[in-house]
UniProtKB/Swiss-Prot annotation:
PANTHER family: CHROMOSOME 5 OPEN READING FRAME 34, ZGC:153352. It comes from the Eukaryota. This is Uncharacterized protein C5orf34 homolog. It comes from Bos taurus (Bovine). InterPro entries: C5orf34-like, C5orf34-like_2nd, C5orf34-like_C, C5orf34-like_dom, C5orf34-like_N. Pfam families: C5orf34-like_N, C5orf34_2nd, C5orf34_C, Polo_box_4.
Length: 638
């Protein structure tokens, strides 16, 4: 069986795996279906299509079971909702429990129960019921969580009936478990059961373990064997997350781990980076008091919307090397595993990436538009001192002999991933793709069609459109279209926020249909297009909230501030003055009072309204508008 070279997890939790022999495996977003594409033989014709096998995950044959299991393990480690097929999980990894484990309770911050400091410097926080625990290494850049999760179920009504039948027995089991828990304290004790033996192998801990209240789980497993119909099958799921982007359900135990690690460091006298810890704990310090975490639930065995599955087929005519080809799936990338190195991305307000070479160190993208600089964080084993280095993408150092990894190749690979995500964020389709497992009732799906916030047409320049998904489209008269991301949070949140650009890239579409991704800082020959759109966006964010339609009923061109509308106002004002003779009548007012009395009633009303003060104010506004026009022309360099 061929080994994996690259595994990619996308934002919709779909997976693509590339093997060393050229074969590929694709996993649907829900995990219930997969497509295996065999590598074509050497003697195959260039136009010959490779052999493809498409199967349900629950009914996978033995030829692809091991490969599919590793792909699912990779998916479940980083996905929002795991997919756990009972037919693929090994028997030693299954646990039968009578109660429904849907949430866990963590210890209080004031007590030291369930908190363990291991010899490797890792802090482990265990839940009071023993159904979950969190591990934070001494680097404090990422953490792992282990929790019990019920295997994927069939979408039928029999599950609801079985849950109702188990409701009465659940209370009795909880009562028994509570009595067992009162016999011992979790403080300074370790777990000891079948699952915890696996924990000790992973953590390589040499500390002696003692029995605790969680031993009741082992008793429940024995008790449940005579009544298999009344039990639920669970398995342990391991997930890895970044401290900088912690999910909501793990924020409280992470705050406990960070607090406990700081306490141990202060007692041992280890110098720590206080500034970095404050940055990491800024989002989790407010989680005190949220001791209960709702555990993620596994997806159903069968997909509710299999018609939404999309498969990408490789092109046999263009054989590219691994890691150098573009990602064929039109979706944002969440995690990439490439030759032992993990790349983790976040897409909240801007694209950022973290590189984990596997030795405990990490690279983080930095800079005004993330991706121009990378900061390297590591801890020396001898002195346990933190080391930080900053690398510029345009000036990477050469490879050093004997180094465990190439800094140049890692950062270049990360830059390619960021560029792919920039293309997807500037695409017109990725926000509108409907994910299959998000169609299940009860799961929030916030992906809706964007609303048109503002549309302006400038004669001689083009049309500008701003949407609620932070996209800006500019269609110039010469046929070139520019697309960029601009944060219009003030439109929806009813507050003035001028965060500006969320990407350091913009996309140009030429009249022949070709696209080009260019850096906004260095637009080169396309500077006039970029500066014109950015000026329009900056002016748009300065408009007051009262003038911004949150839900426009129609896409009527808005020209309240544009140059064309101001010029049109000036022309109308001059025409009004010329037709009514206001200037002549005002200058000769003292000499021609008799003629003024002969004017029609409408002219008398106009004379009273338009006096010398109003004319001076209008001229002052006209001069300001002309200055704005000059500044716009000088900046755009037409």
């Amino acid at each position: 069986m061929a080994a994996e070279v690259q595994m990619v997890l996308y934002e919709d939790d779909s997976v693509q795996v590339q093997y060393i022999d050229g074969s590929r495996l694709q996993l649907s977003p829900c995990g219930s279906e997969f497509l295996f594409e065999k590598a074509p033989p050497v003697s195959a014709h260039p136009l010959q299509q490779p052999e493809r096998i498409r199967q349900r995950t629950h009914f996978v044959i033995s030829a692809y079971r091991e490969q599919l299991q590793r792909a699912l393990d990779f998916r479940n480690s980083f996905a929002t909702c795991p997919f756990l097929s009972e037919s693929i999980i090994p028997s030693e990894m299954k646990t039968r429990i009578l109660i429904d484990v849907s949430e866990v309770r963590w210890p209080s911050l004031d007590t030291g129960d369930g908190m363990t400091y291991m010899q490797s410097g890792t802090v482990r926080i265990s839940s009071l019921d023993g159904h979950a625990y969190l591990c934070l290494p001494k680097s404090q850049h990422e953490f792992t969580v282990h929790f019990l999760c019920k295997v994927s179920q069939k979408p039928d009504s029999s599950i609801e009936v079985s849950e109702k039948n188990n409701k009465g027995k659940k209370d009795k089991q909880v009562e028994k478990a509570g009595k067992i828990c009162t016999r011992g304290s979790l403080s300074g004790q370790r777990l000891k059961n079948k699952e915890n033996e696996l924990y000790h192998q992973i953590m390589k801990s040499e500390e002696p373990s003692e029995k605790s209240c969680v031993n009741g789980a082992k008793g429940r497993e024995v008790l449940s064997s005579p009544h298999p119909k009344d039990t639920c099958i669970y398995t342990w799921v391991k997930q890895c997350w970044s401290v900088a982007s912690c999910p909501e359900e793990w924020k409280y135990p992470l705050s406990l781990a960070l607090h406990f690690h700081d306490k141990i460091s202060s007692m041992s006298g280890i110098d720590a980076d206080i500034t970095q810890k404050r940055m990491l704990t800024s989002d989790v310090s407010e989680e005190r008091g949220k001791e209960v975490s709702v555990l993620p639930r596994a997806l159903l065995l069968s997909c509710p919307a299999p018609h939404l599955h999309r498969w990408n087929f490789s092109d046999s005519l263009s054989q590219k090397q691994f890691g150098e080809e573009e990602y064929s799936y039109h979706e944002l990338v969440k995690v990439v595993w490439y030759k032992g190195v993990t790349y983790r991305l976040t897409h909240k307000h801007m694209n950022s990436i973290e590189i984990y070479p596997g030795d405990g160190s990490v690279f983080k993208s930095e800079g005004a538009y993330l991706g121009n600089y990378f900061t390297y964080y590591s801890i020396r084993e001898e002195s346990e001192e933190r080391e930080e280095k900053t690398y510029a993408v345009n000036n990477l150092p050469p490879d050093r002999p004997g180094s465990p990894f190439s800094v140049c190749s890692l950062i270049k690979q990360a830059t390619r991933i960021l560029q792919h995500c920039a293309k997807m964020r500037l695409s017109l389709s990725h926000n509108y793709r409907v994910c299959c497992w998000k169609m299940v009732p009860g799961i929030n799906d916030s992906s809706v069609l964007p609303l048109l916030l503002r549309e302006s047409f400038v004669p001689g320049v083009g049309r500008f459109l701003a949407y609620s998904d932070d996209k800006v489209h500019a269609i110039f008269l010469d046929g070139i279209t520019l697309t960029l991301n601009w944060n219009f949070g003030s439109f929806i949140e009813k507050r003035q926020v001028n965060r500006g650009l969320t990407l350091g890239w913009c996309k140009l579409t030429f009249p022949d249909g070709q696209n080009q991704l260019i850096q906004i800082q260095h637009p080169r020959p396309y500077e006039r297009y970029v500066t014109t759109v950015i000026s329009w966006c900056r002016r748009l964010t300065q408009i007051s909230q009262q003038e911004i339609p949150i839900h426009p009923s129609s896409s009527v061109p808005e020209e309240s501030w544009s140059v064309a509308s101001e010029l049109e106002k000036i022309q109308k004002f001059n025409l009004l003055l010329e037709s009514s003779g206001v200037l002549n009548q005002t200058s000769n007012k003292k000499n021609k009072q008799s003629l003024d009395r002969c004017k029609p009633k409408s002219s008398e009303t106009l004379l009273k309204e338009v006096n010398e003060k109003s004319v001076s104010v209008a001229l002052k506004k006209t001069s300001e508008i002309l200055q704005d026009i000059d500044n716009l022309l000088s900046n755009s360099k037409w």
